[in-house]
């Protein structure tokens, strides 16, 4: 009985045996002896009585296992068995399940810390999440990663009951992740500084006897208005002017000569009259104290009696002294008025001079700074808007193709039935090299070249895995990943004598990403292995005669 098309023999038309069960087909079914059926993307399964919930797993945890000893095979859950370079993640709140809940269907990496612990690190929406892996999960990840890339991807609900599958992150997965990052809106704080450059990449690829060496140098410079030093200089000038205005106001309020009071004046005539009256009254009072200054009356008996009236000469003397005092008071009032007015005028003149100097130096200079800074801001913004686009990219590509003689020997494969496999036809190397040269020298004039940033810039591709055996089925993909900036735009189907019906990715980056994905989807180039991006639930069954290409280079 044939064992199936396990040797990738195109002459054997037998399906691959059914796969072991996923945990979603075993959970909750133990002890009842029924078969488990599934029509998921990994093909039909009609299998055994599950080992979950059995006597060997009755404790429902592994804390009772002896440390350092291997786990009993009966205790292995289905998720610990790798299948098609991947395994299923259960909803068991373990490290990988926790990471999957945080980052979803995204790429994560595995790192080893100094203390020997292994952590899985993923990122989503700018938030990085890390979990400490158990030894069994780390061993499972290593078992599906023979190349040691330490990069894996959650491929969504491809397992049973919506469980996520873990596979090695292929190059197209990293490219898809970069596309998603480019399509996500950027924050305002992520603008790049002026003069930033993105590097120089060189990649050598050998394919079917032809060596194709491509060197691509890309220089990208970005600038923003906030990174322009002239803008900050203008804003600093405006700020200096505002500070000058405030300082000038404070100085004028505190340090200048205060406003003088109105001068106090006295009426000279009123002062003279008041002084004259006061002097007359005072002298008259003093004169009455001396009886000799009064007139006397002689009575009938001849006695002299004071009459109470001052003598005429005394009155005249008093009047003369009063007038002199009034005149002196008048002159004094005139002098006092003149001095008060002079003092007021001097203080007012000094204050006006200080105000003139401070206003001219303070307000004038500050206003000039504010005006100049405002003009500088306006001119800088206008020049920045005029010099758009902000991002300027210069790309220089040099391609050199050299040929060498390769002798292809057909392989004789003998299947289990005893049939003899006929030698495969040899490809013409000249036609292949001509095809590569013609497609690599083609340029398309599309708007997507200058406006779409290349998402494949940081993806390193190696098509010829040293750990994967090479067959003569001509299943190699041409010109994939020649440079760091390849966006494939041409699809070429292989010759009819090959067993791989998938499409070839050829050409120069020109036609954009969406058209390439659409053409790949229509040509079936994405339907290999586990269903790919567009494959249905029966894709693995329909391609049983066309086995997937060796290795994990598939679209996930």
Curated annotation (Swiss-Prot):
Q: Which InterPro entries match?
A: Tir_central_sf, Transloc_intimin_rcpt, Transloc_intimin_rcpt_C, Transloc_intimin_rcpt_cen_dom, Transloc_intimin_rcpt_N
Composition-biased stretches (Low complexity)? 213-224, 257-277, 434-448
- Please describe the post-translational modifications of this protein: Phosphorylated by host kinases.
Q: How does it sit in the membrane?
A: Multi-pass membrane protein
Q: Which residue ranges are assigned to the Cytoplasmic compartment in the record's topology?
A: 1-230, 384-556
Cellular component terms (Gene Ontology): extracellular region; host cell plasma membrane; membrane
- Its domain of life? Bacteria
Q: Where is this motif: Essential for actin pedestal formation?
A: 454-456
Q: Does the keyword Iron apply?
A: no
Q: Which residues lie on this side of the membrane: Extracellular?
A: 252-362
List membrane-spanning regions: 231-251, 363-383
Q: Specify residue ranges for compositional bias: Basic and acidic residues.
A: 182-205
For the keyword tRNA processing, the answer is no
Q: Which Gene3D superfamilies match?
A: Translocated intimin receptor, central domain
Record family assignment? Belongs to the Tir receptor family.
Subunit structure, interactors included: Interacts with intimin and host proteins.
Q: What is this protein called?
A: Translocated intimin receptor Tir
